[in-house]
Regions:
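N-terminal amphipathic alpha-helix/helix-capping segment at the start of soluble metabolic enzymes
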Residues: 2, 13-34, 97
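Alpha/beta catalytic cores of nucleotide-metabolism and tRNA/nucleoside-modifying enzymes
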Residues: 3, 7, 206-216, 225-268
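Active-site-adjacent beta->alpha loops and helix N-cap segments on the catalytic face
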Residues: 13-21, 68-76, 88-95, 117-122, ...
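Hydrophobic faces of well-ordered beta-strands that scaffold small-molecule active sites
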Residues: 31-35, 60-62, 107-111, 136-138, ...
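Glycine-rich beta-to-alpha transition loops that act as phosphate-gripper elements at the mouths
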Residues: 35-41, 110-118, 142-143, 164-168, ...
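Catalytic cores of alpha/beta
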Residues: 45-50, 168-177, 224-240
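Glycine-rich phosphate-binding active-site loops on the catalytic face of alpha/beta enzymes
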Residues: 62-67, 135-137, 142-145, 186-194, ...
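Alpha-helix-loop-beta-strand connector modules within alpha/beta enzyme cores
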Residues: 75-108, 152-161, 165, 202-218, ...
Length: 268
């Protein structure tokens, strides 16, 4: 039986702004673009975020830099380190999010739990909501330890997005789906983020298992960077998250828009 996330204890209804934006219609694949707040500067990340928001993406994920980013590959790690060296903070990242959110595309924050705890979770939730953020991903926050942080996010009308990995067992997938709102994030590989030539075999079985347990949109991330990847994902998930490839473009003084437009051609 499909687990309606709106029925999970204290969870948000399924039809949030984020869920509506990412739900596939007619088999099309939605695209979520990732940038790092403060990379290479606060102003530049806002400018890039606005350009990406106007490029046809369904949502934008903004990373909050952290000194110990366990899930980040080398490209995103470098971006985070540079942002920290330039003085980016949680408060600064919320300002970046506010600047990008004005464009109308849903903004999702990706943050590790320690910066949130250091900032004050209740304050973080309130200010993220005021900034126009739609949801938050905390990859190192287990469901069993999610309260009271997830409760404060819910009270601020923010989706809490949890992740499913290739190694996640079916009963655990059901639990994750019942606690997620906005969408469920499927990690395509075991390990860290980063551009890859090929996506792993067997990932479609994971997507199918997740869909048994939720009516939320299902997004795939980690290693997605090519049109071939988008074609392989289309019809199996609702959305694809592209991160390292865009951050690499920004490293080269670009904005990732040309890459996004090329990828979007393979989404329909």
């Amino acid at each position: 039986m499909v687990a309606d996330a709106g029925r999970a204890q204290g969870a948000l209804p399924v039809k949030t702004k984020l869920a509506n934006a990412l739900k596939s219609k007619g088999g099309d694949l939605k695209l979520v673009a990732y940038i790092m707040a403060g990379h290479p500067s606060a102003k530049r990340s806002i400018d890039v975020g606005k350009r990406l928001a106007a490029s046809g993406i369904a949502a934008i994920e903004i990373g909050i830099p952290h000194s110990d980013p366990l899930a980040d590959g080398p490209v995103i790690q470098r971006a985070g380190q540079a942002a920290l060296q330039h003085g980016m903070t949680v408060a600064g990242a919320l300002e970046v999010a506010a600047g990008v959110a004005k464009e109308g595309v849903p903004v999702v924050l990706m943050t590790y739990i320690n910066p949130v705890l250091a900032y004050d979770p209740r304050k973080f939730a309130a200010e993220a909501s005021q900034a126009g953020v739609a949801g938050v991903i905390v990859p190192d926050l287990p469901i069993e330890e999610a309260e009271p942080v997830s409760g404060w996010l819910r009270s601020a009308s923010l989706d809490t997005v949890f992740m499913v990995a290739p190694t996640t067992q079916p009963d655990r997938i059901a639990t994750i789906c019942s606690h997620s709102s906005g969408f469920v994030y499927c990690v395509t590989v075991t390990g860290i983020t980063g551009v890859r030539k090929d996506l792993p075999a067997g990932m479609t079985e994971m997507f199918a298992e997740v869909k048994k347990h939720t009516s939320l949109p299902v997004a795939a991330g980690f290693g997605i960077s090519r049109q071939e990847h988008m074609k392989a994902l289309r019809g199996h998930v609702d959305a694809a998250v592209v991160g390292s490839a865009i951050v690499d473009e920004i490293d080269r003084a670009g904005d990732g828009v040309a890459l996004v437009r090329e990828l979007l051609k393979a989404c329909r």
